[in-house]
């Protein structure tokens, strides 16, 4: 549905809903300043067509690092800048640990699952997930071994192209998805498996739909737009199809479960369900399982694969950086074994390049919404319990107080005078605090192993000259993706 039609519909019903809103109890508290909202419309007129991020960054210039916007009738507090975000999510971690609502996902997730739960449900599921994914199955293959296996499969697949140009999107989706599938489902899929290809297609299409203008408008007025056509309808359909597939996988696991030898995340969860079946208040139920698996699969596939697409586009733009990384690979790893996470500490330049790619690419500029769990005083303002909070991670990744050239790709941002890796408090691609990305450790190891394995085995080439490569991303709502490109992987 086009923006103009949505706006007209909003204005048409706005008066009636405004009358309803006047009968509702007012929010107590003293929220940060912000643009004056219109009845029901909120700050719709301050939101430009380029999306929430551009609108918020413009408002930051006027109102500072902490301000309030009204997304439709509901107030949302916006946090900008490294210090502001860390002060909230780290220094007052418990108060800001609630999960806000993502309107286009809520009809499916409904507060279930490790990513979208809040309160004790979230704490219970997060503890379980962290332990299960870190110590996965006593005596079983480690997560890193699974990543290395996928890296080897990728290298063999790329060799089949014999240096011919290709769009790497599908292969990068496949290796990221297979890593999480191996952990959660206990198996990896062939790159030509039809069901696997269909799942990847659903993930990609759903991500694009979530970034559409229609979805952003839905975020403001979901209460009545849910009754009309729009991207949210297809998102719901896609997610339900993925849930049905996951439910089928869960039933297969249940039928073949061996309590003495859990194979994966699902097996481990089913064993915990059985252990707590007499506890009527347990959070280990079917709904939390399937939504957790859906969340892990979706997040683990799209974010890592998009980062890899950005990574190699940037390497094509700056071939001297790729050459320097290859030199470090040759010195530390050589050519006769796959990289391991342990190699990273001996490869500061490569590590700095990966850090800078994540910072510069800035793929998730607006973190998932938070919600304060109690009345909270923050920088002199009173945020009532359940106030939603948006941390603008992009404002940290491009914070001029921490990065000398925030809008320029420069690995030196993460190297000290001695060439050692330099940490930065502004490096927040995974967010921070209690809600930091559950799969941060896995994602970091994936990026390192996949990146170094490819450059260990291949020299990169492009049909386009480096000076003509455009790194300007495509903005999809609250996220970014690189423009499609072709790349040649030439065997070294």
From Swiss-Prot:
<dbReference type="GO" id="GO:0020037">
    <property type="term" value="F:heme binding"/>
</dbReference>
<dbReference type="InterPro" id="IPR017972">
    <property type="entry name" value="Cyt_P450_CS"/>
</dbReference>
<dbReference type="InterPro" id="IPR001128">
    <property type="entry name" value="Cyt_P450"/>
</dbReference>
<dbReference type="InterPro" id="IPR036396">
    <property type="entry name" value="Cyt_P450_sf"/>
</dbReference>
<comment type="function">
    <text>Cytochromes P450 are a group of heme-thiolate monooxygenases. In liver microsomes, this enzyme is involved in an NADPH-dependent electron transport pathway. This isozyme seems responsible for metabolism of 2,2',4,4',5,5'-hexachlorobiphenyl.</text>
</comment>
<dbReference type="InterPro" id="IPR002401">
    <property type="entry name" value="Cyt_P450_E_grp-I"/>
</dbReference>
<comment type="similarity">
    <text>Belongs to the cytochrome P450 family.</text>
</comment>
<dbReference type="InterPro" id="IPR050182">
    <property type="entry name" value="Cytochrome_P450_fam2"/>
</dbReference>
<dbReference type="GO" id="GO:0005789">
    <property type="term" value="C:endoplasmic reticulum membrane"/>
</dbReference>
<dbReference type="GO" id="GO:0016712">
    <property type="term" value="F:oxidoreductase activity, acting on paired donors, with incorporation or reduction of molecular oxygen, reduced flavin or flavoprotein as one donor, and incorporation of one atom of oxygen"/>
</dbReference>
<dbReference type="GO" id="GO:0008392">
    <property type="term" value="F:arachidonate epoxygenase activity"/>
</dbReference>
<protein>
    <recommendedName>
        <fullName>Cytochrome P450 2B12</fullName>
        <ecNumber>1.14.14.1</ecNumber>
    </recommendedName>
</protein>
<keyword id="KW-0560">Oxidoreductase</keyword>
<keyword id="KW-0408">Iron</keyword>
<keyword id="KW-0597">Phosphoprotein</keyword>
<dbReference type="GO" id="GO:0043231">
    <property type="term" value="C:intracellular membrane-bounded organelle"/>
</dbReference>
<dbReference type="GO" id="GO:0019373">
    <property type="term" value="P:epoxygenase P450 pathway"/>
</dbReference>
<keyword id="KW-0479">Metal-binding</keyword>
<keyword id="KW-0256">Endoplasmic reticulum</keyword>
<keyword id="KW-0492">Microsome</keyword>
<dbReference type="GO" id="GO:0005506">
    <property type="term" value="F:iron ion binding"/>
</dbReference>
<feature type="binding site" description="axial binding residue">
    <location>
        <position position="437"/>
    </location>
    <ligand>
        <name>heme</name>
    </ligand>
</feature>
<dbReference type="Pfam" id="PF00067">
    <property type="entry name" value="p450"/>
</dbReference>
<keyword id="KW-0472">Membrane</keyword>
<dbReference type="GO" id="GO:0005737">
    <property type="term" value="C:cytoplasm"/>
</dbReference>
<dbReference type="InterPro" id="IPR008068">
    <property type="entry name" value="Cyt_P450_E_grp-I_CYP2B-like"/>
</dbReference>
<dbReference type="GO" id="GO:0006805">
    <property type="term" value="P:xenobiotic metabolic process"/>
</dbReference>
<keyword id="KW-0349">Heme</keyword>
<keyword id="KW-0503">Monooxygenase</keyword>
<feature type="modified residue" description="Phosphoserine">
    <location>
        <position position="129"/>
    </location>
</feature>
């Amino acid at each position: 549905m086009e923006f103009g039609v949505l706006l007209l519909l909003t204005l048409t019903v706005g008066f009636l809903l405004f009358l309803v809103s006047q009968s509702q109890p007012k929010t107590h508290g003293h929220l940060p300043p912000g643009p004056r909202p219109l009845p029901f419309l909120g700050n719709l007129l301050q939101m430009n067509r380029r999306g929430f991020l551009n609108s918020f960054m413009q408002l930051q210039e006027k109102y500072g690092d902490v301000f309030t916007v009204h997304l439709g009738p509901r107030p949302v507090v916006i946090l900008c800048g490294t210090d502001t975000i860390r002060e909230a999510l780290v220094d007052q971690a418990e108060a800001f640990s609630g999960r806000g609502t993502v309107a286009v996902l809520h009809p499916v997730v409904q507060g279930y699952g490790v990513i979208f739960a809040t309160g004790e449900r979230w704490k219970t599921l997060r503890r379980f997930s962290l332990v299960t994914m870190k110590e996965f199955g006593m005596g079983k293959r480690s997560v890193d071994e699974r990543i290395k296996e996928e890296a080897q499969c990728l290298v063999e697949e790329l060799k089949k192209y014999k240096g011919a140009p290709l769009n790497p999107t599908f292969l990068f989706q496949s290796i990221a998805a297979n890593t999480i599938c191996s952990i959660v489902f206990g198996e990896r899929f062939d790159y030509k498996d039809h069901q696997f290809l269909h799942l990847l297609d659903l993930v990609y299409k759903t991500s694009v739909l979530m970034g559409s203008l229609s979805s952003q408008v839905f975020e403001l007025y979901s209460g009545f737009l849910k009754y009309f056509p729009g991207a949210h309808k297809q998102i719901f359909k896609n997610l339900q199809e993925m849930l049905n597939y996951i439910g089928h996988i869960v039933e297969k696991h249940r039928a073949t479960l061996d309590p003495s030898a859990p194979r994966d995340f699902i097996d481990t969860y089913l064993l915990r369900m059985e252990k707590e079946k007499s506890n009527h208040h347990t959070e280990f139920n079917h709904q939390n399982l399937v939504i957790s698996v859906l969340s892990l699969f979706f997040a683990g596939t799209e974010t890592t694969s998009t980062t890899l697409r950005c990574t190699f586009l940037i390497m094509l733009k700056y071939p001297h950086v790729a050459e320097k990384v290859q030199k470090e690979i040759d010195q530390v790893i050589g050519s006769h074994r796959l990289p391991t996470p342990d190699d990273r500490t001996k490869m500061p330049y490569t590590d700095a390049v990966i850090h800078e790619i994540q910072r510069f690419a800035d793929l998730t500029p607006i973190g998932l919404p938070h919600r304060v769990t109690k009345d909270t005083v923050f920088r002199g303002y009173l945020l009532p319990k359940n106030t939603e909070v948006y941390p603008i991670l992009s404002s940290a990744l491009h914070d001029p107080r921490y990065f000398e050239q925030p809008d320029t790709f420069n690995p030196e941002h993460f190297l000290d005078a001695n060439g050692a890796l330099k940490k930065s408090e502004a490096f927040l691609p995974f967010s921070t605090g209690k809600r930091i990305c559950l799969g941060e450790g896995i994602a970091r190891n994936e990026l390192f192993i996949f990146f170094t394995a490819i450059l260990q085995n291949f020299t990169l080439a492009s049909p386009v000259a480096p000076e003509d490569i455009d790194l300007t991303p495509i903005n999809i709502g609250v996220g970014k993706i690189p423009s499609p490109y072709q790349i040649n992987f030439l065997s070294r």
